Amino acid sequence: MGFEIPEPYKWDESFQVFYEKLDEEHKQIFNAIFALCGGNNADNLKSLVDVTANHFADEEAMMKASGSYGDFDSHKKKHEDFLAVIRGLGAPVPQDKINYAKEWLVNHIKGTDFGYKGKL
């Protein structure tokens, strides 16, 4: 069982990791998934892939630089697996895959990213 998926699907303060850059990037991913719901096309899918890949690179760089986040390899693998899924999609994206992306992001932030709060 995962965390509750917000409706409407948007970032709120319950998703704060308290690193401004990462919170802003999480908002961008929420917005990209929301945009895909409203306009299921190749441009919105590309935007989702791009903002997600950029965020993962930034987050992983912060984790490595901190030297105090002990779950880096597992965290990075989750990023790689999610990117593989969304990079493998074509437009229009099936609704079950949009739902998967929504659920994955919520559960990843609250279940995994929250583990680095105060450590980066």
UniProtKB/Swiss-Prot annotation:
Residues the record lists as binding Fe cation 1: 26, 55, 59, 113
Domain of life: Eukaryota
Keywords: Cadmium, Cadmium resistance, Iron, Metal-binding
Biological processes per GO annotation: response to cadmium ion
Positions with a binding annotation for Fe cation 2: 59, 75, 79, 108, 113
Tissue specificity of this protein: Expressed and produced in a hematopoietic center that floats freely in the coelomic fluid before being stored in a particular hemocyte type: the granulocyte type 1.
Transmembrane segments: none
SUPFAM superfamilies in alphabetical order: Hemerythrin-like (SSF47188)
Coiled-coil boundaries: none
Pfam families xref list: Hemerythrin
GO molecular function: iron ion binding
InterPro entries attached to this UniProt entry: Haemerythrin (IPR002063), Haemerythrin_Fe_BS (IPR016131), Hemerythrin (IPR050669), Hemerythrin-like (IPR012312), Hemerythrin-like_sf (IPR035938), Hemerythrin_metal-bd (IPR012827)
Family: Belongs to the hemerythrin family.
Function, as annotated: May act as a buffer to control the concentration and therefore the toxicity of cadmium. Also involved in defence towards bacteria growth by acting as an iron scavenger.
PANTHER family registered for this protein in UniProt: BACTERIOHEMERYTHRIN (PTHR37164:SF1)
Protein name as it appears in the record: Hemerythrin
Organism of origin: Hediste diversicolor
Lineage, opening ranks: Eukaryota, Metazoa, Spiralia, Lophotrochozoa, Annelida
